[in-house]
Amino acid sequence: MTAQETERIRRELADSLPHEMFCFQCEQTAAGTGCVWRQGACGKRSSTANLEDELTGTLIAYARCVHDAGVTSPCAHASLPMIEGMFCCITNVCFDDDAVRALIGRIRERIDHVSGRHGVDAADYPAYDMNLVWNADEDVRSLKSLLLFGLRGMAAYAYHARMLGADSQTVDDFFFRALYEISATDDPQTLLGLVLECGRVNLECMAMLDEANTSTYGDPVPTTVDLTIEPGPFIVVTGHDLADLEQILEQTDGRGVNVYTHGEMLPALAYPRLKEHPQLKGNFGTAWQNQQREFKDIPAPIVWTTNCLMPPKDSYADRVFTTEAVAYP
């Protein structure tokens, strides 16, 4: 049997199986085309994937409601649930169905609030059907997906900046406008313009986060990082939310508990304000994708702060802690 025949049979078999979800957000997606069965390549269950589609559709409904109400620049309070909802849908952030349902409820409350204040009917804003994106013309689907995934990535930066007290009206406005346009247009040129604009706005968002980080913790300096684990109790913090790490350091000051970064938290060791805490000892392990092997039987709690969570193995499942939008049931 040739490789081509094997691939044809594999695809026919795949097409014959019932599809329980659709997600092609990450480069590890099944067969390079999309995860469609009970569990995604990332470990996300189909129920969670479908709820995240509902959450995204509800965020689009929120954007439509704000647009129709004539609100051109939503305030920071109105924008935060939008940012948190987008952040929740990034790969490796949320595996908890109840947490997604709670976010959907918060967005519905925002729709009710806006409609009540501005004379529009909340009933006119059900969750947008994401199948209209996934099943659209190939070019339209590609552009809308690229825009949506870009918005989700930008939401992570915006959320971390917000936790440090920084926000940008330009960034916040673009979340609403871009999501509205996903539901309002199928014109490829309009969508391409929005994709390019997303890149420009994302650059501004990254600059905002960098300014928030450096103004709070100082400019990073060249730092030698210790990779050994000292005897005694310790905590591992992974992800890239510096505010969460700072809170853990403040709560462990003088308590004889050491703190180690992991994965994307490694750069935190270069910030002068964080280096002032002597219990921030160094880095444990390597990259986030190695966590299931590296955390096996680890005698310490691990705190996930951003999009780096993989379904935990039994050997350390009782030591998993998450913050903010990150959640595991």
For every predicted segment, state its role.
Residues 2-329:
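Metallocofactor- and cofactor-centric catalytic cores in central/energy metabolism, strongly enriched
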